[in-house]
Design a protein with these regions (language model features):
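Conserved beta-strand-loop-alpha-helix junction that forms the acyl-donor binding cleft
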Residues: 129-138, 162-171, 188-189, 199-200
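A short beta-loop-alpha structural element at the N-terminal edge
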Residues: 3-21, 25-29
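Conserved acetyl-CoA-binding loop-helix of GNAT-fold acetyltransferases
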Residues: 133, 139-152
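Conserved beta-hairpin
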Residues: 57-75
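Conserved active-site alpha-helix within GNAT-family acetyltransferase domains
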Residues: 144, 156-157, 167-184, 188-189
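Conserved GNAT acetyl-CoA-binding A-motif
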Residues: 124-126, 154-166
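Conserved acyl-donor/pantetheine-binding loop and adjacent beta-alpha core of acyl/acetyltransferases
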Residues: 71-132, 138, 187-188
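Active-site rim helix/loop that mediates acceptor-substrate recognition in acyltransferases
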Residues: 36-61
Length: 201
């Protein structure tokens, strides 16, 4: 049985594990991250620890899916007025991971971040920053449970949901929940980034 609870009930280490294992070979991270998988995993784990801290401090923060005693999925959300997190705090939290990534990956990461901020939806919305399920729990309904909670929050607030995805398979998945493509960008090494919006019910 899978239980969905607030993200603030999950440990930072577990959140970082789920996000990193889920996205290790995802197109977005292959585009911007270090080449070697082990190096990329270490960088991503540190980045996702910082992401969890940002979510707790400035985010909604989102939801955690637990199966047994194990965290198997996370959804990280922000109100539109809270995104992006304030500077220099946000960059200082990211700095150790950028240093560890090396100069070229750090530059790619900064360029990708700038692209996402430039293209970000600028009207009131709920931002779904991350939706991740650990690999062995994927295609078992965990993502659906998390996304349904996020959709309920947005509908209660009367706001649309905005997200980005660099994974082609995610585009039809999100369409199944009422999202439509509103634009498309390119990451530094050419991977496409889809921008999607779900109107509130």
């Amino acid at each position: 049985m899978t239980t969905v609870t607030s993200l603030d009930q999950a440990s930072g280490r577990d959140v970082a594990r789920v996000l990193t294992d889920s996205f290790l070979d995802a197109p977005g991270w292959l585009d911007v991250g270090p080449e070697r998988a082990r190096h990329r995993w270490v960088v991503m784990w540190g980045y996702h620890r910082a992401l969890h801290r940002k979510a707790l401090q400035w985010g909604c923060p989102g939801y955690a899916a637990v199966r047994g005693n194990r965290l198997v999925g996370v959804a990280v959300t922000f109100d539109w007025e809270a995104w992006p997190p304030p500077e220099p705090n946000s960059t200082l939290l990211d700095a150790p991971s950028f240093v560890l990534a090396g100069p070229w990956a750090a530059v790619r990461g900064a360029r990708a971040d700038a692209t996402m901020k430039r293209a970000h939806f600028h009207e009131p919305h709920l931002y779904l920053w991350q939706l991740a399920v650990e690999p062995r729990a994927q295609r078992s309904g965990v993502g659906r449970l998390l996304l349904e909670r996020v959709i309920a929050d947005a509908d209660d607030a009367g706001t649309p949901i905005y997200l980005e995805t660099a994974k082609p398979d995610n585009v039809p998945y999100y369409r199944g929940f009422g999202f439509t493509e509103t634009g498309r960008e390119k990451l530094p090494r050419g991977a496409p980034l889809w921008l999607m919006l779900r109107p509130h019910s």
